[in-house]
Amino acid sequence: MNCYFEEGEVFTWIRDRERSGENMVVSLKMLKECHRTGSKQAMIAEDIRTGKKYFVKVLFCNDLEQVYVEKESKVQLYSPYIIRIYGGMLDEKNKRFITLVEYIEESDLSELMRGRGIAGDTWNEKMKVRNRIAMKFLLGIDHYMSMYRQDPIVHRDLKPENVLASPDGSVVKIIDFDWVHLHASNVTVMLRREQKGTPGYA
C-alpha cells in the first residue's frame, strides 16, 4: 500500500549532500492535495519556519532501480521561464521519490487561451495579453534549449496544461519537468522503464 501524504501532516524533506552536492533541509506542513493517481501524488506544502510554499511531488516505485541518482552531479534547470526544481529525496522505507518544486499561483495556458481569467476588458486587450504569453513561451523554449545545447534535456510532455501563466502575461513558466529525458551520463535522472507522456505531445 502506498504511503500518501495527508493534509496537515508534517514531514522533513532532506536533499542529501552526497547525492546533490549541497544540503537542504525543509520542515514542511502539507496543506492541500492537488493530484493523486496510483503511483503519483502532488501536494501544496508550507515551510513551517518561513511560511514559503512549495509543490511536493511524490512518485511511488516498487523497483527503486527505476530511480537513479548519480552522486557527483544533479539537474539544475535554472531559468526565469522554467519552474524551479529544488531536488529530490529518496525515501527507501516507503519506496517513494519526493521532489520539491517551486510554487506559483497561476493558471495553465489551456485555460487562459480559452479566455478564462485572462486580463483585459476588450477583445483587443485580451489579444495583446495572449500574444505576450505566446512570445514569453517561445522565449522560454529558446532559452532552455540554448542553455542545455551541450547536454540536451527534452521535456517529452510539452502541452498547454504544462505551461503556467499569470492573467496579464507577466509570468510564464514551463512546468512538469519531473520526467525529463536527458542525453548525458553525468546528470541526476529518474529513469522510466516504460514510455510516459501525453499521447500527441510526448
PLM segments and residue spans:
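Activation segment of protein kinase catalytic domains, centered on the conserved DFG
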Residues: 116-136
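Activation segment/activation loop of eukaryotic-type protein kinase catalytic domains
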Residues: 166-197
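Short beta-strand micro-motifs within the conserved protein kinase catalytic domain, predominantly
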Residues: 84-97
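Juxta-kinase regulatory segment immediately upstream of eukaryotic protein kinase catalytic domains
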Residues: 1-25
